[in-house]
From Swiss-Prot:
Sites where the protein binds DNA: R310, R315
Region feature Head domain (RuvB-H), mapped onto this chain: 255-342
Protein name per UniProt: Holliday junction branch migration complex subunit RuvB
Keyword ATP-binding among UniProt keywords: yes
Binding site for Mg(2+): T66
Organism: Clostridium botulinum (strain Langeland / NCTC 10281 / Type F)
Catalytically driven reaction(s): ATP + H2O = ADP + phosphate + H(+)
Subunit organization: Homohexamer. Forms an RuvA(8)-RuvB(12)-Holliday junction (HJ) complex. HJ DNA is sandwiched between 2 RuvA tetramers; dsDNA enters through RuvA and exits via RuvB. An RuvB hexamer assembles on each DNA strand where it exits the tetramer. Each RuvB hexamer is contacted by two RuvA subunits (via domain III) on 2 adjacent RuvB subunits; this complex drives branch migration. In the full resolvosome a probable DNA-RuvA(4)-RuvB(12)-RuvC(2) complex forms which resolves the HJ.
Key words of the record: ATP-binding, Cytoplasm, DNA damage, DNA recombination, DNA repair, DNA-binding, Hydrolase, Nucleotide-binding
SUPFAM superfamilies the UniProt entry points to: P-loop containing nucleoside triphosphate hydrolases (SSF52540), Winged helix' DNA-binding domain (SSF46785)
Positions of ATP binding: L20, R21, G62, K65, T66, T67, E128, D129, Y130, R171, Y181, R218
């Protein structure tokens, strides 16, 4: 998965993307409902000279959760402190972060569903009362001291909202579902990023890149950079539709945004498991991927695009998946030959 061009996760090559991120809500493209709500809540908080209520962003990776956290910090004129659930190993780690904050600061915790439960409980008074409870001493001599915390905003991000405990989830004032972007929104993101990178690109080429970006801005920016490399070498540096298509075909990202691994999953269901249903564990074992990786990384897009369906008995290939390989269910049953052997 590490070398996938269409992985939605942050990789080393994406570091340049930080310079492409918008810094205000006005610059931010997509997520219209989330953006509209945040605009109202931020303006209301600033009007009352209060910190913004705590926010939880949830949805697939690469859709702009971290970018929105940066924007909120900028709009609230506070500093952004970034950490993650797995990085906070001890109660003292979280206490140190909380006591370093000032009014209107934003604490962003990525993968918040992976917080240790004992550490999570420290957040409860911090979120509700802006207070930190510390126990000093041991045994009968132990006593609890409450420290006041500044009026900060906690922003949590998760790809697995169902794994959050109810007490933690209920303490967020705003729960924002991040959705996949439309092809048109991704085209606008590509055009904007190309301008920042000083690359000339036609809108048709930008749309082609956006269309193959799996509804994910992070992937769109990554593909843009690789298409730029191709056109710098094979063309005059400008990106036209022909150059974009040639570069993306060379990268093995097809017109639906699927790569070799996506096609491998569909091939397995159709040609090796007769279209399904097939259990997720069996499918993961067959294609050599982790179960969680399939469920969190590959499956959301394949379901969202209508290639596979979840059923109580397992995963089933849709008619669209059969059409993708140019076969019908009848042809597949008459010829149970795996594409893997071709």
């Amino acid at each position: 998965m590490e070398n996938r061009m269409v992985t939605p996760f942050d990789v080393e090559d994406d570091r340049e993307q930080y310079s492409l991120r918008p810094t205000t809500l006005k610059e931010y493209i997509g997520q219209k409902k989330v953006k509209a709500n945040l605009d109202i809540f931020i303006k209301a908080a600033k009007k009352r000279s209060e910190s913004l209520d705590h926010v939880l962003f949830y949805g697939p990776p690469g859709l702009g959760k971290t970018t929105l956290a940066n924007i909120i910090a900028n709009e609230m004129t506070g500093n952004l402190k970034v950490t993650s659930g797995p990085a906070i190993e001890k109660a003292g780690d979280l206490a140190a972060i909380l006591t370093s904050l000032t009014d209107y600061d934003v604490l962003f915790i990525d993968e918040i569903h992976r917080l240790n439960r004992s550490i999570e409980e420290i957040l409860y008074p911090a979120m509700e009362d802006y207070a930190l409870d510390i126990v000093i001493g041991k045994g009968a001599a132990a006593k609890s001291i409450r420290l006041d915390l500044p009026k900060f905003t906690l922003i949590g991000a998760t790809t697995r909202v169902g794994l959050l405990t109810s007490p933690l989830r209920d303490r967020f004032g705003m729960l924002c579902a991040m959705e996949f972007y439309t092809d048109e929104e991704l085209m606008e993101i590509v055009v904007r990023s190309a301008a920042i990178l000083n690359v000339n690109i036609c809108r048709e080429a930008a749309f082609e890149i956006g269309k193959r970006s799996r509804g994910t801005p992070r992937i769109a920016n990554r593909l843009l950079k690789r298409v730029r490399d191709y056109c710098d070498v094979k063309h005059d540096g400008d990106i036209d539709l022909q150059g974009a298509k040639a570069a993306l075909d060379l990268l093995e990202v097809d017109k639906e945004g699927l790569d070799k691994i996506d096609n491998k999953i569909l091939e397995a269901i159709i040609f090796n498991f007769k279209g399904g249903p097939v259990g997720l564990e069996t499918l993961a074992y067959f294609i050599g991927e982790e179960l969680d990786t399939i469920e969190d990384v590959y499956e959301p897009y394949l379901i969202q695009k209508g290639f596979i369906m979840r059923t109580p008995r397992g995963r089933v290939a849709s008619e669209k998946a059969y059409n993708h390989f140019g076969v019908t269910k009848k042809e597949e049953k008459d010829n149970q030959v795996s594409i893997f052997n071709k």
